[in-house]
Amino acid sequence: MEEHRIYITINHLDDFECASFLKTGDRLILNKERDNIYDDEAIIAYKENKTKVGYVANSVHSVARGTYSAGRLYDRIGDEVGCILKFFFLEEGYGIAEIIE
């Protein structure tokens, strides 16, 4: 049986200073942000030291084709899950990561 991989778009990488220290292959932690007043399916991305680096994209305008939106991912994960940053474009403010369980 073929393994099904889940990829996500992480946005706002350019909004957090620490994002400039990201590198391909970094392990990130995703947490549901239940108290987010703008998006009730918000999922925030952290480095392992709990430094914020971005959010899982949740808009048709920001989700890269072939990746899961935060809304699609929200009910498939627990409160916290890991991911590996596959590549990113810091100037454009987004990256693609693979969910690891």
List each model region and its residues.
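Conserved active-site motif detector
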Residues: 1-101
